[in-house]
């Protein structure tokens, strides 16, 4: 029990015993926080402090271990990619998938030497015959362990690995099926990436995309048309017997292997040529470039022939103009008099037509809503027509033709001009003035 110390004599406390005390209030209180949770766990599981601390320490160690996982481990196969490897005849190890046996079926030719060593260590720990026997495994799996060892020997030797990679057809990516709809770049990109692993030359140009320039596309296909491949097929050779007593047979096997390799190499080169030719034929950029070249060729031809066309057109035009000029001059004098007469008659007819148009405008406009004044309107329109000169007559007629609904305003404007000029008094044009 905790008790407060007694007050010293120099401290006085005044207590108002008559003051009002606030009533008691019941409030819910709940335990929270990580320390309460730890207490609850210990209570529910009947753990002592030492047991609880040991369990927490193990959790912390596990968390640290998981955070320190080798990133290469994430690239290795978690399970055997091909279960048939477990029963594969070790004597026929060359036909086995060595990358799958090593747990590297996803990496294959991309696997580094360090990754191969790590993967081998992991497979040895898992498939060592002693461990398999202790776990009650089959003795047949000893053969698989021998395949693992052969795979390690092959993949850690640069020459042997190159020979195996040459025959690792699992890593090949087939081209898209003909006659199907597909995205050219998504389908062909992995194909060329897989083929590029055999290139002697670097860097290797990228397939690019729809925005690649003509130069980039041409460089890409030029590279593949002149592709220099190191791919060989020694790995598929028939084993040469180590028999010094029968050298003829040994040389026969060697010649047979060389002929088989040459045949496979020729077939592979032909396959690659056909593959590149098909890619060229289906590349949308090549089609676009050909269309552009065709248009450019036609344009250059048109420009090249432009001079000849212009010269021919100029010559024909000059001849036509000379002929027309001669005919015009020959007829000019003869027709001058007739033309003058026709012009006079035409002007007279036009004037008559304009007068008629002005006179009829009032009638066509239903006398502007004043049909009872039709006679007066007709008379005053006639006075306007007779008072206008030829130029004013044409202008007035054109305005009425352009805006028949505004004929009255046009006539008012003409009447005002006549009155202002003193040609007629306003009393004679009272309707419009």
Curated annotation (Swiss-Prot):
Effect the entry attributes to changing residue 128 to Q: Loss of function, but still forms a heterodimer with SSZ1 and associates with ribosomes
Biased composition (Basic and acidic residues): 292-330
Phosphoserine carried by residues: 50
Subunit relationships: RAC is a heterodimer of the Hsp70/DnaK-type chaperone SSZ1 and the Hsp40/DnaJ-type chaperone ZUO1. RAC associates with ribosomes via ZUO1.
Annotated coiled-coil segments of the chain: none
Record's keyword terms, sorted: Chaperone, Cytoplasm, DNA-binding, Phosphoprotein
Additional free-text comment from the UniProt record: Present with 86400 molecules/cell in log phase SD medium.
Cellular component terms (Gene Ontology): cytoplasm; cytosol; mitochondrion; nucleolus; protein folding chaperone complex; ribosome
Top-level division of the source organism's lineage: Eukaryota
The keyword Lipoprotein is annotated on this UniProt entry: no
Pfam families per the UniProt record, alphabetical: DnaJ (PF00226), RAC_head (PF16717), ZUO1-like_ZHD (PF21884)
Alphabetized Gene3D superfamilies for the sequence: DnaJ domain, Ribosome-associated complex head domain
GO biological process terms, semicolon-separated: 'de novo' cotranslational protein folding; intracellular signal transduction; protein folding; regulation of translational fidelity; ribosomal subunit export from nucleus; rRNA processing; translational frameshifting
Residues covered by the J domain: 98-170
SMART domains assigned: DnaJ
Chain spans, region Disordered: 292-357
Function noted in UniProt: Component of the ribosome-associated complex (RAC), a heterodimeric chaperone complex involved in regulation of accurate translation termination and in folding or maintaining nascent polypeptides in a folding-competent state. RAC stimulates the ATPase activity of the ribosome-associated pool of Hsp70-type chaperones SSB1/SSB2 that bind to the nascent polypeptide chain. ZUO1 can act as a J-protein for SSB1/SSB2 only when associated with SSZ1.
Gene Ontology molecular function: DNA binding; Hsp70 protein binding; ribosome binding; transcription coactivator activity
PROSITE patterns: DNAJ_1, DNAJ_2
Localization of this protein: Cytoplasm
InterPro entries in UniProt: DnaJ_domain, DnaJ_domain_CS, J_dom_sf, RAC_head, RAC_head_sf, ZUO1-like_ZHD, Zuotin/DnaJC2
SUPFAM superfamilies linked to this entry: Chaperone J-domain
Name this polypeptide is given: Zuotin
């Amino acid at each position: 029990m905790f008790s407060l110390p007694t007050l010293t004599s120099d401290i006085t406390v005044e207590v108002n015993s008559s003051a009002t005390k606030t009533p008691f209030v019941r409030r819910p209180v709940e335990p929270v926080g990580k320390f309460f949770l730890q207490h609850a766990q210990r209570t529910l599981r009947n753990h002592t402090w030492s047991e609880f601390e040991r369990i927490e320490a193990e959790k912390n160690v596990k968390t640290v271990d998981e955070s320190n996982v080798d990133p290469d481990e994430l690239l290795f196969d978690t399970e055997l990619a091909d279960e048939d490897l477990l029963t594969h005849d070790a004597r026929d190890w060359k036909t086995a998938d060595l990358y799958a046996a090593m747990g590297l079926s996803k990496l294959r030719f991309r696997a580094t030497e360090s990754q191969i060593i790590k993967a081998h260590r992991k497979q040895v720990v898992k498939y060592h015959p002693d461990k398999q026997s202790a776990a009650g495994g089959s003795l047949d799996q000893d053969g698989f362990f021998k395949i693992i060892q052969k795979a390690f020997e092959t993949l850690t030797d640069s020459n042997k690995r190159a020979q195996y990679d040459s025959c690792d057809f699992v890593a090949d990516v087939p081209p898209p099926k003909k006659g199907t709809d597909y995205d050219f770049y998504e389908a062909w990109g992995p194909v060329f990436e897989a083929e590029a692993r055999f290139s002697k030359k670097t860097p290797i140009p990228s397939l690019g995309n729809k925005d690649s320039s003509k130069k980039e596309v041409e460089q890409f296909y030029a590279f593949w048309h002149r592709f220099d491949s190191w791919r060989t097929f020694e790995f598929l050779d028939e084993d040469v017997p180590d028999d010094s007593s029968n050298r003829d047979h040994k040389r026969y096997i060697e010649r047979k292997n060389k002929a088989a390799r040459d045949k496979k190499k020729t077939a592979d080169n032909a396959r690659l040529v056909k593959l590149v030719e098909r890619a060229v034929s289906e590349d949308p950029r090549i089609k676009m470039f050909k269309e552009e070249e065709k248009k450019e060729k036609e344009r250059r031809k048109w420009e090249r022939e432009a001079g000849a066309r212009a010269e021919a057109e100029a010559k024909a035009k000059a001849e036509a103009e000379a002929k027309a000029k001669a005919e015009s001059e020959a007829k000019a004098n003869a027709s001058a008099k007739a033309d003058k007469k026709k012009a006079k008659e035409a002007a007279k007819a036009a004037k008559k037509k304009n007068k008629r148009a002005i006179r009829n405008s009032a009638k066509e406009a239903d006398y502007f809503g004043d049909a009872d004044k039709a006679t007066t309107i007709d008379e005053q329109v006639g006075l306007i027509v007779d008072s206008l000169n030829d130029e004013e007559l044409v202008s007035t007629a054109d305005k009425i033709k352009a805006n028949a609904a505004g004929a009255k305003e046009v006539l008012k404007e003409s009447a005002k001009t006549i009155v202002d000029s003193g040609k007629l008094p306003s009393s004679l044009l009272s309707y419009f003035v």
